[in-house]
């Protein structure tokens, strides 16, 4: 573990087409093996498909989908006297965004459409309408936290 100060966070540049930092982070998460141009074509293709299918502004649908997936509370394991408790804790905004992005991409990759752009557009549309596997993951997380509410006094 580093003994010095924490390194400052790198500033992520906004994406070239929409000028949005969150979309840029999303693209970086979609990227595999450092192939940014492939990730860009997938994400932009998905956003174009969203625009064609939903007749809505694609960036708005993207942000709405992320807002619907973003968790407010999660459970973390805490060991107390030989027993491990699942303690519900609030999620920091930056972690909530990271989890939402991760869950959205995982849900899209598990879909059955042919191309990744089609899978991503389908999951974005589902998530913006409060459906789909990514939203289900958020609901499951909230349900877990609610079920373990009795252990909330073990917060740290």
UniProtKB/Swiss-Prot annotation:
Pfam families: Ribosomal_S7
Keyword field contains tRNA-binding: yes
Cellular component annotations (GO), alphabetically ordered: small ribosomal subunit
Parts of the chain that traverse the membrane: none
Coiled coil: none
InterPro entries: Ribosomal_uS7, Ribosomal_uS7_bac/org-type, Ribosomal_uS7_CS, Ribosomal_uS7_dom, Ribosomal_uS7_dom_sf
Family matches, as Gene3D superfamilies: Ribosomal protein S7 domain (1.10.455.10)
PROSITE patterns: RIBOSOMAL_S7
Cross-referenced CDD domains: uS7_Bacteria (cd14869)
GO terms, molecular function: rRNA binding; structural constituent of ribosome; tRNA binding
Listed GO biological process terms: translation
Keywords, alphabetical: Ribonucleoprotein, Ribosomal protein, RNA-binding, rRNA-binding, tRNA-binding
HAMAP family: Ribosomal_uS7_B
Quaternary structure and partners: Part of the 30S ribosomal subunit. Contacts proteins S9 and S11.
Family: Belongs to the universal ribosomal protein uS7 family.
Job description of the protein: One of the primary rRNA binding proteins, it binds directly to 16S rRNA where it nucleates assembly of the head domain of the 30S subunit. Is located at the subunit interface close to the decoding center, probably blocks exit of the E-site tRNA.
Protein name in UniProt: Small ribosomal subunit protein uS7
């Amino acid at each position: 573990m580093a003994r010095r100060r924490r390194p400052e966070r790198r500033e992520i540049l906004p994406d070239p087409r929409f000028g949005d930092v969150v979309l840029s982070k999303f693209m970086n998460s979609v990227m595999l093996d450092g192939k940014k141009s492939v990730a860009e074509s997938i994400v932009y293709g998905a956003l174009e498909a969203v625009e064609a299918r939903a007749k809505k502004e694609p960036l708005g649908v993207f942000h709405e989908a992320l807002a619907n997936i973003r968790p407010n509370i999660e459970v973390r394991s805490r060991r107390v006297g030989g027993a491990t408790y699942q303690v519900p804790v609030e999620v920091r905004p930056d972690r909530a965004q990271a989890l939402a992005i991760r869950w959205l991409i995982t849900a899209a990759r598990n879909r059955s459409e042919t191309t990744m752009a089609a899978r991503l557009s389908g999951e974005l549309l589902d998530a913006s309408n409060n459906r789909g596997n990514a939203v289900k993951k958020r609901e499951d997380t909230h349900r877990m936290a609610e079920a373990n509410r009795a252990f909330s006094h073990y917060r740290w």
